[in-house]
Swiss-Prot record:
<keyword id="KW-0694">RNA-binding</keyword>
<dbReference type="Pfam" id="PF00849">
    <property type="entry name" value="PseudoU_synth_2"/>
</dbReference>
<dbReference type="InterPro" id="IPR002942">
    <property type="entry name" value="S4_RNA-bd"/>
</dbReference>
<dbReference type="GO" id="GO:0120159">
    <property type="term" value="F:rRNA pseudouridine synthase activity"/>
</dbReference>
<dbReference type="InterPro" id="IPR000748">
    <property type="entry name" value="PsdUridine_synth_RsuA/RluB/E/F"/>
</dbReference>
<dbReference type="GO" id="GO:0003723">
    <property type="term" value="F:RNA binding"/>
</dbReference>
<dbReference type="Pfam" id="PF01479">
    <property type="entry name" value="S4"/>
</dbReference>
<dbReference type="GO" id="GO:0000455">
    <property type="term" value="P:enzyme-directed rRNA pseudouridine synthesis"/>
</dbReference>
<feature type="active site" description="Nucleophile">
    <location>
        <position position="121"/>
    </location>
</feature>
<dbReference type="InterPro" id="IPR020103">
    <property type="entry name" value="PsdUridine_synth_cat_dom_sf"/>
</dbReference>
<feature type="domain" description="S4 RNA-binding">
    <location>
        <begin position="16"/>
        <end position="83"/>
    </location>
</feature>
<protein>
    <recommendedName>
        <fullName>Uncharacterized RNA pseudouridine synthase ML1370</fullName>
        <ecNumber>5.4.99.-</ecNumber>
    </recommendedName>
</protein>
<dbReference type="InterPro" id="IPR018496">
    <property type="entry name" value="PsdUridine_synth_RsuA/RluB_CS"/>
</dbReference>
<comment type="similarity">
    <text>Belongs to the pseudouridine synthase RsuA family.</text>
</comment>
<dbReference type="InterPro" id="IPR050343">
    <property type="entry name" value="RsuA_PseudoU_synthase"/>
</dbReference>
<keyword id="KW-0413">Isomerase</keyword>
<dbReference type="InterPro" id="IPR006145">
    <property type="entry name" value="PsdUridine_synth_RsuA/RluA"/>
</dbReference>
Length: 256
C-alpha cells in the first residue's frame, strides 16, 4: 500500500477536507474521522492517507475506510420495500396490474431511474431493494458475488428432521442442482410448518421449486433478508431508506 502525506493531492474546485467527507457520509463525527485518518484506515484512490489537511474531490476520487467504499454522492438513492403479496415487481405493467412502480411514483421524487435488486413473484411477499446506484445493483444481482437471501416459507405437512440436511446437500431441478445454505424449522401446527431458509442464488421461483421438489409445496412465502439488509417489522407496502451502515455492508459484500 502506497502511503501519501501531501495535503495538496487535489486542488479541484470540488475538493474538501477528507474528514469532512467522512463526516458527511455518516462514517463518523469530524473528530472521530480525524482519528481514522491518523490511524491509517483511510484510502483515497488506493493510496493510504494520514494527513488531516488532505483535500479530496468526492465526485472524482474513491474514498475507502477499512477497505470499504464510502458513499458520498447525495444523488444516490437506496431503498428497501416490503412488496405486498399480489403486486408485481415491475416498474410498470401494460395490463394495468398493481406493480412496484405504482408505489415508487407516489413516494420517490425527481423521476429517478431505479434498479431492482431481487425481484419477487406476484404471489410472494417481502424485501426488494431499489437503487439508482447501477454498479452496486449489478454486483448484488450477479451470481458470482453470492449475496445471501433469507425466506420464511409456510409449507404443507410436517417437516421431518432430515429435511434440512437434504436441502443442504441439494436437489436436482429442471435447470440444474440447487441447495440451501441454512435451514431451520420456526414453528409447526397440524398440517403446516413454518421454515426459514437461506440461499445465495436467485433463479426464478427457486425457493418454491426447491421445497416442492423436496415434497413440501409452499403455501406462503416471504423474503426477509438480502445480504446485510433485513425486513424487520416493515409492513407490506412500506418503503424506507437504507441506513448508512446497511449501504456500507452491501458495498463490502460485493467488493466495492
Amino acid at each position: 500500500m502506497v502511503e501519501i502525506h501531501d495535503s495538496r493531492m487535489d486542488r479541484g474546485a470540488g475538493a474538501v477536507r477528507l474528514q469532512k467527507i467522512l463526516s458527511r457520509a455518516g462514517i463518523a463525527s469530524r473528530r472521530a474521522a480525524e482519528k481514522l485518518i491518523i490511524e491509517g484506515r483511510v484510502e483515497v484512490d488506493g493510496q493510504l492517507v494520514r494527513e488531516l489537511g488532505t483535500r479530496v474531490d468526492p465526485d472524482v476520487s474513491v474514498v475507502r475506510v477499512d477497505g470499504v467504499k464510502v458513499v458520498v454522492d447525495d444523488s444516490l438513492v437506496y431503498l428497501a420495500l416490503n412488496k405486498p403479496r399480489g403486486m408485481y415487481s415491475t416498474m410498470s405493467d401494460d395490463r394495468g396490474r398493481p406493480c412496484v412502480g405504482d408505489l415508487i411514483e407516489r413516494r420517490v421524487r425527481g423521476n429517478k431511474k431505479l434498479f431492482h435488486v431481487g425481484r419477487l413473484d406476484a404471489d410472494t411477499e417481502g424485501l426488494i431493494l431499489l437503487t439508482n446506484d447501477g454498479e452496486l445493483a449489478h454486483r448484488l444481482m450477479h451470481p458470482s458475488h453470492e449475496v445471501s437471501k433469507t425466506y420464511l416459507a409456510t409449507v404443507k405437512g410436517a417437516v421431518p428432521r432430515g429435511l434440512g440436511k437434504k436441502l443442504s446437500v441439494g436437489l436436482e431441478l429442471d435447470d440444474g442442482p440447487a441447495h440451501v445454505d441454512d435451514f431451520a424449522v420456526v414453528d409447526a401446527i397440524p398440517g403446516k410448518t413454518l421454515v426459514r431458509l437461506t440461499l445465495h442464488e436467485g433463479r426464478k421461483r427457486i425457493v418454491r421449486r426447491l421445497l416442492t421438489a423436496a415434497g413440501f409445496p409452499v403455501e406462503m412465502l416471504v423474503r426477509t433478508d438480502i445480504g446485510a439488509v433485513s425486513l424487520g417489522d416493515q409492513r407490506p407496502g412500506c418503503l424506507r431508506a437504507l441506513l448508512r451502515d446497511e449501504i456500507r455492508q452491501l458495498y463490502k459484500e460485493v467488493g466495492l
